[in-house]
Amino acid sequence: MSIKTIEGTLEATNLKFALVVSRFNDFIGQKLVEGAVDCIVRHGGSEENIAVYKCPGAFELPAVAKKAALTGRYDAVITLGAIIRGSTSHYDVIAAEATKGVAQAGLETMIPITFGVLTTENLEQAIERAGTKAGNKGFDAALAAIEMVNLYRQV
């Protein structure tokens, strides 16, 4: 008896994506969008199959992601943004709720919804993760979305 391993491929040809990005910390969000688009195109996707939805902040990401998933127009939804710690507990609340909300939206819709939202201690860390020293987490979130779409199709 052999164990069958099933994995998603990294092929984005003909896949349709919704990118839901927070406008708060917009400079970082735009860099994450650029990384996600780059990933999709490098893996055979086209810019014509990508829609970008901008919402006010990270707290609103789950609702817009769920609504986009429920339209049936997209194979996957990629959430992007940056939550940067400040001097109050607001960061902790927003980071927890955005993370939980995006995960819940994915479970409720059964459409792959990936989390490309940076949660950093400072702006420098966010910049590093949006395309400089630590790669681009938007690219990583798009790669996960591509793989998940192709895995879902085999389950």
UniProtKB/Swiss-Prot annotation:
Pathway: Cofactor biosynthesis; riboflavin biosynthesis; riboflavin from 2-hydroxy-3-oxobutyl phosphate and 5-amino-6-(D-ribitylamino)uracil: step 1/2. The active site is at H90. InterPro entries: LS (IPR034964), LS/RS (IPR002180), LS/RS_sf (IPR036467). The keyword NADP does not apply. It holds the Pfam family DMRL_synthase. (2S)-2-hydroxy-3-oxobutyl phosphate binds at S87, T88, R129. GO terms for cellular component: cytosol; riboflavin synthase complex. It catalyses: (2S)-2-hydroxy-3-oxobutyl phosphate + 5-amino-6-(D-ribitylamino)uracil = 6,7-dimethyl-8-(1-D-ribityl)lumazine + phosphate + 2 H2O + H(+). CDD domains: Lumazine_synthase-I. SUPFAM superfamilies: Lumazine synthase. Its EC number is 2.5.1.78. 5-amino-6-(D-ribitylamino)uracil binds at F24, A58, F59, E60, A82, I83, I84, F115. Belongs to the DMRL synthase family. PANTHER family: 6,7-DIMETHYL-8-RIBITYLLUMAZINE SYNTHASE, 6,7-DIMETHYL-8-RIBITYLLUMAZINE SYNTHASE DMRL SYNTHASE LUMAZINE SYNTHASE. Catalyzes the formation of 6,7-dimethyl-8-ribityllumazine by condensation of 5-amino-6-(D-ribitylamino)uracil with 3,4-dihydroxy-2-butanone 4-phosphate. This is the penultimate step in the biosynthesis of riboflavin. NCBIfam families: lumazine-synth, PRK00061.1-4. This is 6,7-dimethyl-8-ribityllumazine synthase. It comes from Chlorobium phaeobacteroides (strain BS1). The lineage of its organism: Bacteria, Pseudomonadati, Chlorobiota, Chlorobiia, Chlorobiales. The gene is ribH.
